[in-house]
Amino acid sequence: MTVTENSLHGVRRLWAEMNGYGIGYGNDLRPDLSNLQYALQALKESGAKADDPAFQRAIKFLERSQNLSEVNRNSYYNREDDNKKVVSGDDGGAVYYPGNSMAGYVELEDGTLVARSYGSMTYALLKCYLFAGLDITDPRVAAALAWIERNWTVEVNPGFNSLRDPRAAAQGLYYYYLSLAQCLGETGKKFVTT
C-alpha cells in the first residue's frame, strides 16, 4: 500500500468510526444518505435480512444524518460558511450527510449552524431505518415520522427556504416524489396524518 493509499484508508476508517458506515462516490471520501438508501435497498431486495451487518453498521451514519440530538451529539464544521460549527437540531428530519444539507442552514443566536432537514432525505432516512429492522415505536423512527407529518406536502420538497430563493423548494422535486413513494411503500402506511 502506498503512502497515499494508506492515508486514504485512514481517512475513510476515521470517518466510519466517527459517523458510521455509508456509501458515497467521488474524490471527497465521504458517504451520503442519498447513495446509502439505494445501497441498502439493493441489499434488502437481494434478500438480506435486517440483522445483516451492513444494515447494522449503517445505523450510526443514519443517526448522524438525523436532526435528533438524543442520538446525534456530534458537531461538524461547515467548509462553505467560514468553517462555522454545525450542530444537530431536534426536528427529527434528515440531512444529506452529517453536518451538511442541500437545503441550507439555520444560524442560531450563538453563531452555530443547524443543517436544515428536508423531505427527500427524511424519507431516505426512514426507509433505511426500516430496512435495519427498527419499527415505528423506536424514537428515531417516530421522530422522522413526526417530521413527515408536520411537513407533509406534494407541492415542494419540504425544508428548503423558498424565501431566500423562490426556486429552492423545487430542488429535487421528482427525486422527492420517488423517495416519498418508496418510503411509504416500506412503512405499509396508506395515509399520512397531518
Predicted features along the sequence, with ranges:
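An alpha-helical repeat/solenoid feature that recognizes helix-turn-helix modules
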Residues: 1-60, 64-194
